[in-house]
UniProtKB/Swiss-Prot annotation:
Cofactor(s) listed in the protein's UniProt record: Ni cation
Subunit structure: Heterotrimer of UreA (gamma), UreB (beta) and UreC (alpha) subunits. Three heterotrimers associate to form the active enzyme.
Protein name: Urease subunit alpha
Highest taxon of source: Bacteria
Entry's Gene Ontology BP terms: urea catabolic process
Residues annotated as transmembrane: none
Residues given in the record as Ni(2+) 2 binding sites: K217, H246, H272
Positions of the catalytic residues: H320
Localization terms from the record: Cytoplasm
Gene Ontology molecular-function annotations: nickel cation binding; urease activity
Comment on bound cofactor: Binds 2 nickel ions per subunit.
UniProt-annotated binding residues for substrate: H219
Amino acid sequence: MSRISRRAYADMFGPTVGDRVRLADTALWVEVEKDFTVYGEEVKFGGGKVIRDGMGQGQMLAAQAMDLVLTNALIIDHWGIVKADIGVKHGRIAAIGKAGNPDVQPGVTVPVGPGTEVIAAEGKIVTAGGIDSHIHFICPQQVEEALTSGVTTFIGGGTGPATGTNATTCTPGPWYLARMLQAADSLPINIGLLGKGNASRPEALREQIAAGAVGLKLHEDWGSTPAAIDCCLSVAEEMDIQVAIHTDTLNESGCIEDTLAAIGDRTIHTFHTEGAGGGHAPDIIRAAGQANVLPSSTNPTLPYTVNTVDEHLDMLMVCHHLDPSIAEDVAFAESRIRRETIAAEDILHDMGAFAMTSSDSQAMGRVGEVVLRTWQVAHQMKVRRGPLAPDSSYSDNFRVKRYIAKYTLNPALTHGIAHEVGSVEVGKLADLVLWSPAFFAVKPALVIKGGMIVTAPMGDINGSIPTPQPVHYRPMFGALGAARHATRMTFLPQAAMDRGLAQELGLQSLIGVAHGCRRVRKADMVHNTLQPVIEVDSQTYQVRADGELLVCEPASELPLAQRYFLF
């Protein structure tokens, strides 16, 4: 039997079982747990390579073969870190295993035929497209920025740069919901809209859900009173949609105890649960320990650095329509920004108490930095806290699975769309992101949306090859024309489907039905199930989880930062 060195094999076909890969310039390493390919029968495209007629490519018709195969990919997902070929059919993941020609090769589960396109993923990492569950739809250009960061799904609300949208993630009322659903139909990203949940009577909430709101948002700027919370959750239970909440920073209508009492044992998604983005001062962070609370962070506080506190005051004044000449407005802003709770947030993420990350796009958050900042937190916690059990000093597989779930599967579960998106699993939309390991979490090599490349770095269009400078991200064919409709999905509640809303509005995109989110609990948050008793000292703002003081020095230097953005 012929043999080659591990190094030569990895250079040719990518890493295999036992090999380690460093994630960009972080302190994080992953180890390949399983290899689905067959040694000696690997497929690779190119001159003199395997995927040729009668060799790695068979004679089957399109119905029996894949539309697209990603060869020799290193998949990083909540369920594993494995080497495999990925097959895509009709825009969905159809197989994960061994690609090739079953007529002449053993173990083939991903058949390649004359109708099959190939993307070479040797030496590349493949992850699921990210889900940003805290989007202010302030401008449509957010979509391009998000796609080039590896995010392929938006959940949020808004109508453009209106004052209400600048502050709150709500698309209020049936008319605006209809117009935003029609606008979203032309955007090459999956979208679900949140209606305004602040009402003390149910009728106006029911009509928003019937008009297409996949969830409702309670926001203090509209009045997150106990009555509004109870009414909103009652309608959500009745109509099977999720509720997201930004609680009462000023504690005017009640403190955290009153909010938790109004919520009861009903499931709710708490936004920026640390509190700098808004919420009961100083102890909204306590909510992260509740069994029915699905807690997320927004990215301005992630990770805690020497600059975090200083930038927050101005952000807050702008986004929430505050006046720096009014002392009460300044006091309101300052009450939300606490070094101690911001520092504790990183640690609670590492412990698995905070389950999700998101952006808060253009409203105290950066839409293109959800993926990047999630991994900066993971790095910082590795440096500060060491390996995370059951990891060893050799690899960080469990920590990596915990963190990737925060912006993929867990927000999908939270909003009832995990049957369509959120992981690299058979049957789901082929929303896939390819990364060169050196650029992981910073600059994708390709972004695939519903089976088509939607954006990619591309060189000089008049070049003789695709790679000459200047290279920058450009929209690809998956983002154009009717291909957008065949590769993107609009999420609607069952109530909207029952009335034929998609047909009524003339929507041409794929339609996904959000459902089952009322049954989701903290225990269902993959790799992020911890429910500690969290205490906050009202004078010092020190945070304890199950009695342990959570203290973390701010970072003065981070990976995934300046060295990647010089040009």
